[in-house]
Design a protein with these regions (language model features):
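Short, surface-exposed connector motifs at secondary-structure boundaries
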Residues: 13-21, 82-87, 144-150, 168-172
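Metal-coordinating catalytic core of metallo-dependent amide/deamination hydrolases
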Residues: 32-157, 162
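Metal-associated gating/positioning segment near the N- to mid-region
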Residues: 1-34
Length: 172
C-alpha cells in the first residue's frame, strides 16, 4: 500500500513538473509501482533494488541470484506494459558483489535492456574502490567488461579524465 501511494505521488509530481518520463532507480514492491506508472501515461523505466553485500539489514538482504531473479520477475510482468521499460539495476555499487554486477549485466544484455547504477556520487565511493581494487568505479566496471551503450550511470559527479575517456570509448 505504501509503495502504491508513493508511486501515485511520484507520478503526480512528475506530471505536475511538466515531465513526460522518468527513470526509477528501484526499491522493493516495485510491482505496485509498475501498476501505477503503467496507468499514468508516463514513459518510464523502473528497476528492482539489487544489493547483495554482507551486512545489509535482514529485510533487504539477498544473494546475487535472488537479486537478478527479482528483476527478471519484474521484467516479465511489466516490461512493455503501457510506456514502461524495466532496467536491471546496481542500487549502490559498493553494496554489490562482482557476481551480482556480472549477472545483472549479462541479463540486461540478454533482455536487450539497460543496466543502471548510481555512479561516482561521493568521494567515499571512489575511495572505497581505490582502496580495494586500486581502480576508480568506472575503471573497475570497465575491467569487468560491463560498460557499453546499454549502461546508464546516474549522477557521475566525481569523474577523472580517464573515466571520462572510458565513458566516451564505451559509449556509455
Amino acid at each position: 500500500e505504501k509503495m502504491r501511494l508513493s508511486a501515485q505521488a511520484a507520478a503526480a509530481e512528475v506530471i505536475h513538473a511538466g515531465s513526460t518520463g522518468f527513470i526509477d532507480a528501484g526499491s522493493y514492491f516495485m510491482e505496485e509501482a509498475a501498476k501505477v506508472y503503467a496507468g499514468s501515461g508516463l514513459r518510464g523505466a523502473l528497476s528492482y533494488s539489487t544489493m547483495d553485500q554482507a551486512g545489509l539489514p535482514e529485510s533487504i538482504a539477498m544473494d546475487a541470484g535472488t537479486a537478478v531473479q527479482k528483476t527478471d520477475e519484474l521484467y516479465e510482468g511489466f516490461h512493455g506494459l503501457g510506456n514502461l521499460k524495466v532496467y536491471y539495476s546496481l542500487r549502490s555499487l559498493i553494496s554489490c558483489s562482482e557476481e551480482l554486477i556480472l549477472r545483472a549485466a549479462e541479463r540486461a544484455k540478454e533482455k536487450q535492456t539497460m543496466l543502471q547504477a548510481h555512479m561516482n556520487e561521493y568521494p567515499g565511493e571512489i575511495n572505497f574502490y581505490m582502496e580495494r581494487k586500486q581502480l576508480r568505479p568506472y575503471e573497475y566496471l570497465d575491467s569487468l567488461g560491463v560498460l557499453g551503450e546499454h549502461f546508464l550511470g546516474a549522477h557521475s559527479l566525481h569523474l577523472s579524465e580517464q573515466e571520462i575517456e572510458i565513458l566516451k570509448d564505451r559509449k556509455v
